């Protein structure tokens, strides 16, 4: 995995810690930065940003697909550091949310932007989206390899 496995591990660990904190201490919405950022516990039976709620089998297959695809892509010998980082972020995020689904039957979301109407999300979701963004950016730069 070309030496960046720590990124996936860090994402997974950060996701688990924030979810355990939210599960234990976050009972209702809390504003961190007025009008900008807050925390609000929400049980999500869907995937990132509540998409596909009520389809647990499809979500499990999709999570396994992301994990498998990221793992296979990381086995590629000439993958640049941006692509490696993006894939590791996706791997850690997918593993974090899959662990929730397997352990609880739902994913705990808690991060909320207050200045726009948007879904509540978690660290794993943010890393999945950021990792995808890095891969797309790299593709447009023409740097997905070497």
Per-segment meaning from a language model:
Residues 1-146:
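Alpha-helical transmembrane bundles and membrane-interface segments of multipass inner-membrane proteins
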């Amino acid at each position: 995995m070309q030496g960046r496995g720590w990124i996936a591990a860090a994402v997974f660990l950060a996701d688990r810690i924030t979810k355990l904190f939210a599960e234990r201490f976050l009972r209702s919405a809390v504003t961190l930065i007025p009008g900008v950022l807050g925390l609000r516990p929400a049980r999500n039976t869907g995937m990132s940003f509540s998409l596909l709620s009520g389809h647990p089998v499809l979500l499990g297959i999709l999570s396994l697909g992301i994990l498998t695809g990221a793992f296979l892509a990381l086995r590629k010998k000439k993958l640049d550091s941006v692509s490696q980082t993006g894939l590791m972020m996706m791997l850690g995020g997918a593993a974090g949310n899959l662990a929730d689904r397997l352990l609880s039957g739902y994913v705990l979301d808690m991060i909320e932007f207050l200045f726009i109407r948007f879904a509540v999300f978690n660290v794993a979701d943010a890393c999945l989206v950021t990792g995808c963004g890095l891969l797309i950016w790299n593709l447009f730069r023409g740097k997905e390899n070497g």
